[in-house]
Amino acid sequence: MSDILNKIEAYKREEIAAAKRERPLAALQAAARAAPPPRGFVSALRAKLADGDYALIAEIKKASPSKGLIRPDFDPPALAKAYQQGGAACLSVLTDTPSFQGHLDYLVAARAAVSLPALRKDFMYDTYQVVEARAHGADCILIIMAALDDSEARDIEDAALDLGMDVLLEVHNHAELDRALALRSPMIGVNNRNLRTFEVTLATSEALAPLIPSDRLMVGESGIFTPDDLARLARVGMSTFLVGESLMRQQDVAAATRTLLARAA
């Protein structure tokens, strides 16, 4: 595991312990049961693909550890609406505060502004966080295979599926892909960013895509900025993408989203 993930795990486990003291699991489970039903995340992506379109998971991200502040005028509902107008299939909302200046309130506000399904983008280490995600309206969660062992990943996946949510299984090498394929979720995200060096290359997706069975939904993550990048990954069968930073930096987010998703004539 990389040094960055070690640091993140340390503060996340402190956060989780504090959250459990503040809001016991039973209370959180009641809130999750009372939450609006999940919107189908995988089904929304597959519907776009069935229409012959790219399927975009558009990310709402204020900052990152590597780039610092990305968008000073940060308005999650307005950004969600812009993404929906631009043709996104789903949202991804950062909820980690120390590294990304995210918050669960941003997830609630963004999802309420649109009809799109939303992913809680965070570092998941405990099933408590899964219930917390559903209680705040999340339709999908992220499992980073590099951060968890097989037993932890399976427990978190089971908790999400039991609550009717979808799961994005994130991998960035062959070994992590093999582990992810042993789980139940059909959605496999290939992170083009090396979590140890922070180097980004689309070659990661190009190398792993042929190893992913056709019944799985492949998602390209990180390093995707232009229509040419989308076309490059589509050539290896990857037509679903998670894009954040490049769109978050644009003044007109809806127009930038439309431009990114426009296939060459």
Swiss-Prot record:
EC number(s) reported in the record: 4.1.1.48
Gene3D superfamilies linked: Aldolase class I
InterPro entries xref list: Aldolase_TIM, Indole-3-glycerol_P_synth, Indole-3-glycerol_P_synth_dom, Indole-3-GlycerolPSynthase_CS, RibuloseP-bd_barrel
One Pfam short name: IGPS
Keyword Lyase in annotation: yes
Family affiliation: Belongs to the TrpC family.
Catalytic activity as recorded in UniProt: 1-(2-carboxyphenylamino)-1-deoxy-D-ribulose 5-phosphate + H(+) = (1S,2R)-1-C-(indol-3-yl)glycerol 3-phosphate + CO2 + H2O
NCBIfam families for this protein: PRK00278.1-2, PRK00278.1-6, PRK00278.2-4
Biochemical pathway: Amino-acid biosynthesis; L-tryptophan biosynthesis; L-tryptophan from chorismate: step 4/5
Molecular function in Gene Ontology: indole-3-glycerol-phosphate synthase activity; phosphoribosylanthranilate isomerase activity
Keywords associated with the record: Amino-acid biosynthesis, Aromatic amino acid biosynthesis, Decarboxylase, Lyase, Tryptophan biosynthesis
Record-given protein name: Indole-3-glycerol phosphate synthase
GO-annotated biological processes: L-tryptophan biosynthetic process
Gene this chain is encoded by: trpC
